Amino acid sequence: MAFKFKTFAAVGALIGSLALVGCGQDEKDPNHIKVGVIVGAEQQVPEVAQKVAKDKYGLDVELVTFNDYVLPNEALSKGDIDANAFQHKPYLDQQLKDRGYKLVAVGNTFVYPIAGYSKKIKSLDELQDGSQVAVPNDPTNLGRSLLLLQKVGLIKLKDGVGLLPTVLDVVENPKNLKIVELEAPQLPRSLDDAQIALAVINTTYASQIGLTPAKDGIFVEDKESPYVNLIVTREDNKDAENVKKFVQAYQSDEVYEAANKVFNGGAVKGW
């Protein structure tokens, strides 16, 4: 009996020791962080943040790549990663509403802005009464475009329309503009259409024909845009030291320069 007791005691002590080791391994390392990013050209931007974090703050950043926009928030919510950097606020808000995630933004990165482009005019003063203005037809980017047209004074929308207004929400149109909704990939080609005076195009499609917001846009979203991209973490992790260090590293001149290089001058600081 005594032998059995000693054996059980030894096993219990061993299990207890292993449990303690396990707890130690699960503790968060303030000098290490796993960050979810989207694979592709834009991955080059957090790669620079990774280097800045190591050089300036002694933080080891492990980048975890994803091929779509759904999995990074799912992985973050489950605790598989500590933060992610890929989405703007309207998208995050919709994810929180649809999926009930307990996630929070802890820092801004960049606005990759939509802008107004034209081959017919060089300023809004030249925009004639009754001109046709092309905008993307998907709900998110249509709303984004209409809000930008309102911001520059071309139209006025109903109060309280939020981030998804439609042309039915236009209540003032002093130049009697004709808003033409097109598939987003068609917008760059619409600039050659004799009937289109102006097109609102996002950075991805504008860059395909060599246009950049800062250089070629007649008007451009600014850093106050609700579409600024974010660094996001879990609510219970928002004050973690490794998260704070990563935000500081991302919001650096080195990362800003990298973003502008990758997006041909199309990145606007969001901080």
Each model region followed by its residue ranges:
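Short helix-initiation/N-cap motifs at beta->coil->alpha
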Residues: L63-E74, V161-R189
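Beta->alpha turn/N-cap motifs
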Residues: G40, N67-Y69, G79, A83-D93, ...
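Periplasmic-binding protein-like
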Residues: G107-S118, G143-Q150, S207-W271
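A conserved helix-loop-strand patch within extracytoplasmic ligand-binding domains
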Residues: V106-I155
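C-terminal motif of bacterial Sec signal peptides marking the signal peptidase cleavage site
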Residues: A19-G22
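Bacterial signal peptide processing site
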Residues: G24-D26
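Short, polar/charged alpha-helical segment
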Residues: H32, V39-V64, L71, A75-S77
